[in-house]
Amino acid sequence: VGTLYAGEAEFEESCEAIKAQEQVDFTHHVIADLPEYEAHNELWNAWGKVKASYDIFVKVDADTILNRNEALSDIYKLFQQPRVTGVQIKLHDYFSDQLISGLNAFSTEVQFKNSKKRLFADHADRNHDLVIKGEDVSHLAPIGWHCKYPAARQAYHYGLRRALKKQSDIVRRCASMWLKYRDDARAWALTGAMEAGWIYRNQFNYSDERFEKSLNDYQNDSERLIKVENYANMVTS
């Protein structure tokens, strides 16, 4: 089980949920406090060095909490089908209040090559035979919670990245949920989304100077929620 950690509020509970998994033997490997692209590449390299000793690799992000003690066992059973090399099972996402594609697992047949795009660092797996997802694994969804307790910094990062990736449906859904509930976390996610632009295409890590300055500026902006409301109404109209 591989996890990338960069200050996510759910990390401790995520680790506890992994530790509580039953009916499987596993190792939990955590890579902390690296930029997203470098962290992913380090994770692929770490897996490549040890995969001969394991059956599958499951990536559980630090903002993801498995919601039952048999989650890893359920995933493992899917790989008993000989052709299956990849599995993707949906998570319940706090921001959009819906199921989203999220948790991924891989057989040892899969190879990882560093992505050419920093924004899509996780698009690195290849040499698949059969990947099962969607309706084929809907009986296991949701397998966990995504961003269950997001802090402001984390929420801002979520919105910025979703908008940079042009995931307009997720942003629109988040805006609809904020207009309904008026919660602080979704407001920060929308703040990040409305800030997204080409100058952030390589400046979306927590440690990036532009990211930090933008977040600080908004924390001191007394009109931020007015801007968020205008943005939310625009993207949902």
Predicted regions and their residues:
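A conserved hydrophobic helix/loop-capping motif in glycosyltransferases and polysaccharide synthases
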Residues: 1-7
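A short, glycine-/small-residue-rich helix N-cap motif at loop->alpha-helix starts
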Residues: 34-41
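Short beta-strand-to-loop acidic/aromatic patch adjacent to the donor-nucleotide binding site
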Residues: 53-65
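Acidic donor-binding/catalytic loop of UDP-sugar-dependent glycosyltransferases
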Residues: 62-77
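Short beta-strand-to-loop element that shapes/binds the nucleotide-sugar donor at the catalytic cleft/hinge
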Residues: 86-102
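C-terminal catalytic/acceptor-binding lobe
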Residues: 137-237
